[in-house]
Each structure stands twice: as structure tokens, then as C-alpha cells.
């Protein structure tokens, strides 16, 4: 019994000793399953699956898993930085696809930690401070963004699977976003360096630190303004409020930017106060048409190489600038990919900065800062192969009247492929006959400039869209007056012989016209073809007395009166 009792005590002691020795084992310590389960909501699942450094400020689940596989989740990669990036680059235990996508995100995390000048815009979308010199962190920041772009590019086109094979994977969408953001930031930094004189090289080669950017030839069909922009604004940095209902984009490859040009109509269409006393003879001739001064563009960085190693060592990427209205797809290493585009940002930024609403009212009532002649704006660079859709606003209005109509037209693929949108901006205090005549002359100048032979598609089958007073002008453009207007005035108005002769010589060109041959269709919106009863009411007459003719019209009348030797009181 004593032996048996001693043996039992010994076995018990041995078991306790073993259990104590294995106290560090999670299974024995917890006396539970090695895998446990918990419920998550659909929102939590999507956030965990799709969240990354851009959306949540934390590394994505895919990158964290890659760090664990490489044994880097603790130690060197406990904090973001170059040591972690170098360790991941040297790892040999992860697939290239996982490595490149993770490195793109790690470089992005590092780039976001570097100090950057804060971009601030006023309510009109203008930068509050101009860049006059580059900051000390400019080059490290550019290097980091270029590494993001290069690693993402390598993942998309030079790893085990093609982009098409990964088409529905969230990871590819994340890495594409990394590439687009990196190209956006690098493009803006390159522009800032160019604006401050830091870029070296020839016209088509820009050297900045270790990088040499090779400017690719423009698209064959593109007519983007070749001038140097006064600003380069990322479309993603702009948020629009007010009457604009929606922002229209096309998901794809590339950085969506807005190139802000100096507006030739900003100084020519507006009569400056200092010129208020100018005469017809001294008033300078100005171009009556121009492209919208803030065209949208999409920028790509194309890294060269026959294999992954060559791409990862390419420090001379090709810089491609595309017109998203002309180009919908690009070919990258044998794969067709959609080109990213923002069809609203440039148009909305132009309207936000134009101050059209106040200017149109100042014009109507003869205030300073109004306009005195019609001006034609092209919403996109001229395209000879697309028909023209010309919009004419109404009384006391401006191109802002078309903000949502034009925005919806620009987003429609079929309409965008078939038409180019133009808009007339004209002083609505000017007599309709004179506005109509000026618009006809402007259209003639535009078509003569772009298509002297008249054979282009743009010179045929134009569609006019006129609202209110603009509809009346549109109707005149498709009408034939013959001698009716001149004869009616001669028969009904009491005029001196000198006035009659002046009407025949000076007034006939304005009052005699034929249908515009370029126009094939007209859309009228709330157009008073038979006039309006409101004009004859007390309110209408009171408002009419507030309207003032443009200074240029008064000067023209005075000049004609002097030429005809007519007393101005007549």
C-alpha cells in the first residue's frame, strides 16, 4: 500500500510538473480551441477587405499579410519607413505580385509622412498662395511618389498575372489608385519645379534629380492648348457646391488634372473702367472666340522595360498628356486599359472663377465690369470631326444658365463622340439685331480660321439651342430677312432724308441676312417668338428704363451719326 500510494503521489506530481512546464502553450493555458470565431457586420467585412492607407490611414489587410509571410510584421516594419521598404524589397519568400503591390502601398505610406506644402483654394477655386520656390523636402517627396508609381506599374503589367486576369480583384483597384495618385502628385511637383526654374534639359526632356521625364508626342487627334498653364490643379482636390448637381468621371488609368490657362476673354470681353472713355477708333480689336481656359487632361507615366528588372530600374519614364474627350483607351504593354477622365472639373472650375452671374447683371444695367461684345467659348479644343452644338443663353444671363445641361451633355458618351459644345456669352443689353449680327460674324471667323475649305464635319449640321432671348437670336440665324426689315422701317418710321440714306447704307448689313448654312437644327427653350406681355406692364417698363446700352453701341451710333452728318438729337 505504501508503494502504491507513493506511486500515485509521484504520478500526480509528474503531471502537475508537466502542466506547469507547458504553461506558455496557449492551448493548455486557455483550455480552449486554437481557433475562435466572431461575427462581423457586412460593413465591417467590406471595410476590412477594402480598407487601405488611403481610405483608413492604415495598411491594407493584403499588405499586412505579406509582411507576416515575410516575417517583417514585427521588428523592422513595426514603424513605417525606408528600412521596412528595403527589407521587403530583399525578401525572397513572397510572390512578386504580393511584393510589388505591398511595396507600392509602403512607399505611399512613406510619401504621405513627408511634409508637403498645403494646397488651399478660395471659393472661386483659385490657389490662395502662389508657389515661388521649392521646399527642402521637394526631392525626397518626388522620389517617393515616383517609387509608388513605378512599383504600382510593375505590379499591374510585369508580375505573374495580367491586369485582365485580376480584373475583379479589389487589390488591383487599390494599386491602380496608388498609381493614379502618385502620377498626380508627381505631375504637380514637376509643374511646380518648371514654374520655379528648377527643371533642366531640353524641350522634350525634363531632368529633376535622378529622374528624367521624356515628354511623349501629343495625340494625333488632340488639339489641347500647347501654352504653359498658369496653374495645374488636381481634379480630385476640388469639391463643387451650388447649382451643379453632379460630377461626371470615367474610372481608369491616369491622373485627372485641370490645366488653367490665362483667359484671353477675361480681359478682352470685359470693359475695364480705365477704358470707359475710349472711342471706337481707339478701342483695340480683340478675338471674339476662345477655348474654355481650364481644359481637363489625363496624365500617364509609362515606364519602359522588357522585364520586371528593367522596369524597376527605369529612371526615364515617358510623360503622356491625353485629351480625355479624344482618347478613351490606351495600350500599355499590349493591354488595352481605359483612360481615366473627369468631364466636370475643368468646366465647373471655369464657371466658379468666372463671376458670370454678377457680370451679366452689371452688363444689363450698364455697370462697370460688364461685357460689351459677344464672345464664343469652346468647351473643348476644336475637333474637325465632330458637329457643333451651340448654346445661346437668355436675358440677364450667362453661360452659367447651362451649367447642368452642358455638364450632362459632356458626360454622355454618344453625344460626346458626336458633338463638341460651344457657348455664346453676349451682353443682353445690346439690341437683338446687333447681337445677332455680331454672332454671325464670330461664327464666320471661327470657321474661316479652323476650316477655310468648309469641308470638315464641324462646319456642317450644327445644332443651335436657344433659351429665351437666345432662342430669338437662334431663330434669326435660320431666317431670311430679304429687304423686309429695311423696307418696313422706311415705310413706318419718321426719318429725315439723311437718316433714310444712313439706314440703307449702314443699317442694311445688320438688318439683311440669310439662314446660316452650317445650321441644320434648332432647339427653342421658353422662347417668346411672339414677344411677351410682361414687357408692356408697368414692371416691365420700369425695368426697361434701368437697362443701359453698352458703351460700344453708343460709340458706334455716335460715329455713324457723325459720318452721316446727323444731329445726335435726331
Protein language model regions, located:
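Bacterial N-terminal signal peptides that target proteins for export
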Residues: 2-14
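Bacterial N-terminal signal peptides
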Residues: 12-23
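Short amphipathic alpha-helix adjacent to the substrate-entry channel of hydrolases
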Residues: 403-419
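Serine-dependent carboxylesterase/thioesterase catalytic core
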Residues: 112, 116-187, 191, 196, ...
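Short, well-ordered alpha-helical scaffold segments within catalytic/effector domains
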Residues: 372-375, 406, 436, 440-443
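Intrinsically disordered, low-complexity regulatory regions enriched in Ser/Pro/Gly/Thr
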Residues: 382-384, 414-415, 457
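Flexible, membrane-associating and regulatory peripheral segments of lipid-active enzymes
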Residues: 25-389, 398-404, 420-423
Amino acid at each position: 500500500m505504501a508503494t502504491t500510494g507513493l506511486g500515485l503521489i509521484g504520478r500526480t506530481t509528474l503531471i502537475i510538473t508537466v502542466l506547469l512546464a507547458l504553461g506558455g502553450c496557449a492551448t493548455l493555458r486557455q483550455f480552449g480551441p486554437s481557433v475562435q470565431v466572431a461575427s462581423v457586420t457586412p460593413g465591417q467585412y467590406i471595410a476590412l477587405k477594402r480598407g487601405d492607407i488611403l481610405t483608413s490611414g492604415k495598411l491594407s489587410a493584403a499588405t499586412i499579410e505579406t509582411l507576416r509571410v515575410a516575417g517583417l510584421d514585427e521588428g523592422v516594419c513595426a514603424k513605417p519607413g525606408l528600412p521596412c521598404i528595403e527589407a521587403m524589397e530583399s525578401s525572397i519568400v513572397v510572390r512578386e505580385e504580393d511584393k510589388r503591390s505591398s511595396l507600392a502601398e509602403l512607399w505611399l505610406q512613406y510619401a504621405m509622412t513627408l511634409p508637403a506644402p498645403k494646397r488651399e483654394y478660395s471659393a472661386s477655386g483659385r490657389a490662395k498662395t502662389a508657389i515661388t520656390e521649392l521646399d527642402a523636402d521637394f526631392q525626397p517627396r518626388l522620389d517617393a511618389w515616383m517609387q509608388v508609381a513605378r512599383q504600382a506599374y510593375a505590379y499591374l503589367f510585369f508580375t505573374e498575372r495580367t491586369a485582365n486576369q485580376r480584373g475583379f480583384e479589389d487589390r488591383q483597384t487599390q494599386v491602380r489608385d496608388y498609381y493614379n495618385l502618385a502620377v498626380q502628385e508627381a505631375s504637380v511637383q514637376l509643374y511646380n519645379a518648371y514654374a520655379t526654374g528648377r527643371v533642366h534639359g531640353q524641350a522634350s526632356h525634363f531632368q529633376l534629380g535622378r529622374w528624367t521625364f521624356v515628354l511623349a508626342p501629343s495625340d494625333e487627334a488632340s488639339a489641347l492648348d500647347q501654352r504653359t498653364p498658369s496653374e495645374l490643379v488636381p481634379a480630385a482636390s476640388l469639391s463643387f457646391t451650388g447649382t451643379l448637381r453632379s460630377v461626371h468621371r470615367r474610372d481608369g488609368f491616369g491622373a485627372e488634372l485641370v490645366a488653367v490657362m490665362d483667359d484671353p476673354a477675361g480681359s478682352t470681353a470685359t470693359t475695364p473702367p480705365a477704358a470707359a472713355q475710349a472711342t471706337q477708333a481707339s478701342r483695340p480689336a480683340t478675338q471674339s472666340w476662345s477655348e474654355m481656359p481650364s481644359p481637363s487632361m489625363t496624365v500617364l507615366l509609362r515606364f519602359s522595360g522588357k522585364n520586371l528588372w528593367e522596369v524597376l530600374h527605369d529612371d526615364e519614364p515617358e510623360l503622356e498628356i491625353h485629351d480625355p474627350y479624344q482618347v478613351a483607351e490606351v495600350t500599355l504593354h499590349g493591354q488595352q486599359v481605359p483612360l481615366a477622365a473627369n468631364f466636370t472639373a475643368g468646366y465647373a472650375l471655369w464657371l466658379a472663377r468666372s463671376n458670370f452671374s454678377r457680370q451679366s447683371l452689371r452688363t444689363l444695367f450698364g455697370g462697370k465690369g460688364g461685357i460689351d461684345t459677344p464672345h464664343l467659348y469652346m468647351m473643348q479644343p476644336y475637333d474637325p470631326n465632330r458637329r457643333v452644338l451651340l448654346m445661346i443663353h437668355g436675358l440677364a444671363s450667362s453661360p452659367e444658365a447651362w451649367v447642368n445641361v452642358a455638364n450632362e451633355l459632356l458626360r454622355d458618351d454618344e453625344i460626346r463622340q458626336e458633338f463638341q459644345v460651344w457657348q455664346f456669352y453676349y451682353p443682353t443689353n445690346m439690341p437683338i439685331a446687333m447681337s445677332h449680327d455680331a454672332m454671325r460674324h464670330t461664327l464666320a471667323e471661327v470657321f474661316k480660321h479652323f476650316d477655310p475649305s468648309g469641308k470638315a464635319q464641324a462646319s456642317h449640321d450644327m445644332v443651335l439651342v436657344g433659351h429665351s432671348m437666345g432662342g430669338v437670336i437662334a431663330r434669326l440665324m435660320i431666317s431670311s430677312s430679304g429687304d423686309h426689315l429695311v423696307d418696313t422701317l422706311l415705310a413706318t418710321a419718321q426719318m429725315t432724308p439723311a437718316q433714310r440714306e444712313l439706314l440703307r447704307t449702314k443699317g442694311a448689313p445688320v438688318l439683311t441676312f440669310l439662314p446660316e448654312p452650317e445650321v441644320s437644327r434648332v432647339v427653342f427653350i421658353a422662347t417668346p417668338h411672339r414677344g411677351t406681355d410682361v414687357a408692356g406692364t408697368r414692371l416691365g417698363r420700369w425695368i426697361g428704363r434701368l437697362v443701359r446700352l453698352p458703351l460700344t453701341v453708343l460709340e458706334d451710333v455716335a460715329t455713324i451719326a457723325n459720318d452721316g452728318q446727323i444731329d445726335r438729337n435726331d
